[in-house]
């Protein structure tokens, strides 16, 4: 091992960001290098699928966070540092849940400070895209429980939801939308590892992950 190499790049709370070296890559034949490049591009194309599966608001939250950080002029430095800390954890964990514990982490600034930062970012030219067609303050209100309240959707998959609570309804993930365990008693999933189940207009629909189906755009880029 080369003692001059730097492996630990940064620590963010309990998370460590490590650098990995691809020893031997330069010696690979060109066809294997091309394969690795395509796999890398496929991973980038598909990463938003995992974000969306973890929570329905993950992609919109990430967009707002990144727009604030890239349009940060005149935002309070302490608030900006906290938003940066939270965003780094968001990137590391592919969403607002710790990959090891599956529990949600939250921002440590106030709601008012976060809104002020977003409004200032918008003045600086931030465009929040699909997340905020109605204006940043209106759309942020919808995200606030996810950003600040540890008791709202606290865990990705709730295995012990408590008396009277349904496992699916108590889980934060985006695999079952509006569906309870009772709903599934008379419903058979055809693609249980490759679909999302949604209660739609009183009926239950299985949205299959495939070209022409759920995540069409991402899967087309992957394949």
What are these regions (language model features)?
Residues 2-222:
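N-terminal helix-rich structural modules
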């Amino acid at each position: 091992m080369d003692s001059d190499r730097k492996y630990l790049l940064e620590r963010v709370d309990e998370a460590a960001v490590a650098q990995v070296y691809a020893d031997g890559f330069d010696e690979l034949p060109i066809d294997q290098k091309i394969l690795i490049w395509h796999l890398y591009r496929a991973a980038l194309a598909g990463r938003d699928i995992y974000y969306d599966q973890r929570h329905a608001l993950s992609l919109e939250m990430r967009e707002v966070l990144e727009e604030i950080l890239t349009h940060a002029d005149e935002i309070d430095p302490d608030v900006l540092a906290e938003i940066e800390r939270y965003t780094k954890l968001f990137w590391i964990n592919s969403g607002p849940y710790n990959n090891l514990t599956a529990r949600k982490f939250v921002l440590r600034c106030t709601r008012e400070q976060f809104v002020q930062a977003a409004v200032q970012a918008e003045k600086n030219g931030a465009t929040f895209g699909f997340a905020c067609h109605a204006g940043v303050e209106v759309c942020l209100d919808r995200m606030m429980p996810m950003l600040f309240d540890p008791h709202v959707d606290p865990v990705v998959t709730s295995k012990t939801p408590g008396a009277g609570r349904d496992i699916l309804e108590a889980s934060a993930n985006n695999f079952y939308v509006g569906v309870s365990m009772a709903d599934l008693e008379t419903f058979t999933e055809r693609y249980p590892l490759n679909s999302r189940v949604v209660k739609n207009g009183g009926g239950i629909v299985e949205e299959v992950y495939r070209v022409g189906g759920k995540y069409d755009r991402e899967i087309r880029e992957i394949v």
